């Protein structure tokens, strides 16, 4: 019910360290679809200034010819863990971000040593705090001397599975030539699942009953199971932080997820209004006419039984029939 949030990092930078082994993985040519990163998770909180982290698997040798070793490069990023306002399921403020709780913190780190299967020692201290329950991903980054993506080649990532994936990160010290594609489309946060059980008249912004609306999209708060367990809000149109809301009512589509933007410019998850429909917007929300809002695009309307004119008949007008073409599509995610 929402567009995926994708994190892409294609990196060209210099690390100053006696252990630096820039270009150690040599010249890379991509001729087919290929994943070049390896992933694991943080299993204990890590604090600013620390030079050691505890992980699920320190070998990080998937897609590499050897296990993680001194001089290798990793990325550390906290993907989730934000808290939201879930006080009132009947208002659109449900889902507004209260605290990021380290979500979004990330940095690039060089390995000093790997003393055991669950520990990575770093040659420089951490710049940020990280909360393990917020799904902190550790990404091993290849260190190429040059990179060529041939025509037909696709550099990509593993899909986000709720713990790892969804991130493509590389380091190139020399020339990068891309004649193919670097593509991680639809590999990030997962959208809500299609649900055909909702009924007429749903007005809530959060609920655990699928009869009230469709499933929300995943985002920086957590996944759908987290919504149902801790927020009583797996379904319906409210946007949980940057995740798009599910539609309320038959045919009311889900919304898009948000990327970066100004949170103050988010207006009820409407997204960017198309000027072609300014007349229609004026019938519905006059304040949105000509305004570009931050965040994901809003979903559609509930079904109508007549073919009316949206430029003259406002949503909810009795002449629409059916479920009155109500404005109950999912709210676009917050930036």
Where are these regions (language model features)?
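Bacterial Sec-dependent N-terminal signal peptides
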Residues: 1-22
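Autoprocessing Asn-cyclization modules and mimics
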Residues: 21-106, 115-123, 151-165
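Extended Gly/Ser/Thr-rich low-complexity repeat segments
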Residues: 62-80, 128-148, 181
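Glycine-centric low-complexity/flexibility signal
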Residues: 25-26, 86-90, 131, 146-148, ...
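Short solvent-exposed strand/turn elements
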Residues: 115-136, 170-173
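Short coil-to-beta-strand transition motifs
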Residues: 99-108, 140-146
């Amino acid at each position: 019910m929402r567009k995926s949030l994708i994190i892409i990092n294609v990196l060209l930078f210099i690390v100053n360290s006696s252990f630096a082994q820039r270009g150690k993985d040599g010249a890379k040519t991509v001729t087919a679809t290929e994943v070049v990163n390896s992933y694991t998770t943080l299993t204990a909180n890590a604090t600013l200034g620390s030079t050691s982290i505890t992980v699920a698997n320190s070998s990080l040798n998937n897609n590499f010819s050897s296990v993680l070793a001194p001089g290798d490069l990793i990325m550390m990023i906290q993907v989730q863990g934000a808290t939201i306002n879930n006080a009132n399921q009947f208002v659109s403020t449900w889902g507004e971000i209260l605290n990021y709780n380290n979500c979004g913190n990330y940095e690039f780190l060089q390995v000093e040593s790997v003393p055991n299967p669950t520990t990575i020692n770093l040659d420089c201290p951490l710049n940020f705090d990280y909360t393990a329950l917020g799904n902190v991903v550790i990404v091993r980054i290849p260190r190429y001397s040059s990179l060529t993506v041939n025509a037909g080649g696709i550099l990509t990532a593993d899909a986000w599975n709720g713990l790892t994936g969804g991130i493509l990160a590389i380091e190139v010290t020399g020339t990068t030539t891309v004649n193919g594609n670097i593509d991680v489309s639809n590999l990030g946060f997962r959208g809500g699942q299609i649900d055909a059980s909702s009924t007429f008249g749903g007005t809530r912004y959060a609920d655990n009953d699928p009869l009230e609306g469709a499933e929300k999209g995943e985002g920086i708060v957590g996944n759908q199971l987290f919504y149902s367990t801790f927020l009583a809000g797996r379904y319906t149109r409210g946007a949980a932080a940057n995740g798009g809301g599910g539609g309320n009512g038959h045919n009311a589509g889900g919304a898009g997820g948000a990327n970066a933007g100004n949170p103050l410019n988010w207006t009820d998850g409407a997204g960017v209004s198309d000027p072609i429909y300014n007349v229609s917007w004026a019938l519905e929300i006059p304040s949105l006419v000509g305004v570009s809002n931050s965040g994901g695009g809003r979903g559609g309307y509930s079904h109508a039984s007549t073919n009316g004119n949206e430029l003259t008949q406002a949503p909810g007008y009795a002449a629409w029939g059916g479920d009155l073409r109500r404005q109950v599509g999912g709210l676009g995610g917050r930036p």
